[in-house]
A protein has these predicted regions:
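S-adenosyl-L-methionine
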Residues: 132-184
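C-terminal substrate-binding/active-site "lid" region of AdoMet-derived donor-dependent transferases
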Residues: 185, 190-255
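Conserved SAM-binding loop and adjacent beta-strand
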Residues: 8-10, 80-94
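Conserved SAM-binding loop of SAM-dependent methyltransferases across substrates and taxa
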Residues: 115-126, 193
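Short beta-strand element of Class I
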Residues: 127-132, 201
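Conserved class I S-adenosyl-L-methionine
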Residues: 103-114
């Protein structure tokens, strides 16, 4: 497997993870092993049956059941990966990569690495991550999952330390601070010393009360562009001319709160102050209208 975590359509080989989809749209994730077997209610097949076969190979078993085999995407892996801690799900991981603006070479301080789902996504974007994690079993699981998905070479960009982020951050001039913690507002003062001016803090929190606490912690001088959002994911049923929203949707999982640090002593314009700004016609300037200097 290449360091970017994708086998580029090559045939299956020993040690590969394989995403299996049966004819009833049930999903499985296996690792190809010597003498391994995949057991189902419709029978079994040997892992050796897939070695050397191309991606998209479909195996037929009893009762008309078929099993299509693919290299897993990042989404497939996150949903089926071994875990100790609760993971951040794909519907939030995608927006996090955009809101935190993760880029190749980005220096990230991540606290609360959990099972490594978000770490894997940021590493695939080319980030260099220093992770703080309290529990050794979670840290080991995160390293194992990252290596399993992205290969051993990526571990040179992934340094997970047994540290308590509430007690401080040693790193300086980092680009991003990404938090998945019960009380991330306690880390905001430490992020102020860790981030360079223009850096971004992002906190993932399950409850709006937690998100509110983070926002309150970022009300001081030096923080701008604070915002909080959640992502709701609703699929659609499309069959012929029948089109409707799915009866089930992936609704609330967590809140994403971000802010940019511009440096101690810098005073941001507050929302209340923005509302008092008027143009020459005494009309409020809307947030989505450009402000032109004379």
């Amino acid at each position: 497997m290449t360091e970017n975590g994708h086998p580029h359509g090559r045939p299956f080989k020993l040690g590969d993870r394989v995403h299996i989809v049966d004819s009833r749209d049930r999903h499985y994730l296996i690792t190809l092993q010597n003498n391994g077997e995949f057991h189902t209610h419709a029978g079994l097949f040997a892992h050796a049956d897939l070695i050397g076969k191309p991606e998209g190979t479909t195996l037929a078993l009893a009762r008309g059941m078929t099993y299509t085999c693919l290299h897993p995407t990042l989404e497939d892996f996150v949903l089926k990966m071994p875990r100790g801690a609760q993971v951040i799900y794909p519907k939030d991981i995608g927006p996090i990569l955009i809101l935190a603006d993760i880029f190749p070479g980005c220096r990230v301080l991540e606290s609360g690495v959990g099972s490594g789902a978000l770490s894997s996504a940021m590493l695939r974007m080319g980030a260099h991550i220093t992770g703080y994690e309290l529990r050794e079993d979670f840290a080991n699981r995160a390293r194992t999952n990252v290596e399993s998905l992205l290969g051993a070479d990526v571990l040179s960009r992934y340094d997970v330390q047994l540290r308590d982020c509430y007690e401080g951050i040693d790193e300086r001039n980092v680009d991003r601070v990404v938090l998945d913690l019960p009380e991330p507002w306690h880390v905001v003062p430490h992020a102020e010393t860790a981030l360079h001016p223009g850096g971004i803090l992002l906190a993932y929190t399950p409850s709006i009360t937690q998100a509110t606490q983070v926002r309150h912690a970022m009300e001081g001088d030096g923080w701008i562009l604070q915002r909080t959002m959640e992502v709701l994911n609703r699929g659609w049923y499309i069959e012929g001319m029948a089109v409707r929203p799915d009866h089930r949707m992936v609704a609330h999982t967590g809140f994403l709160t971000t802010g940019r640090w511009i440096g101690e002593g810098s005073r941001a314009v507050t929302p209340a102050q923005r509302e008092r700004v008027v143009d020459s016609r005494d009309e409020p300037i809307l947030d989505d209208e450009p402000v032109l200097e004379a």
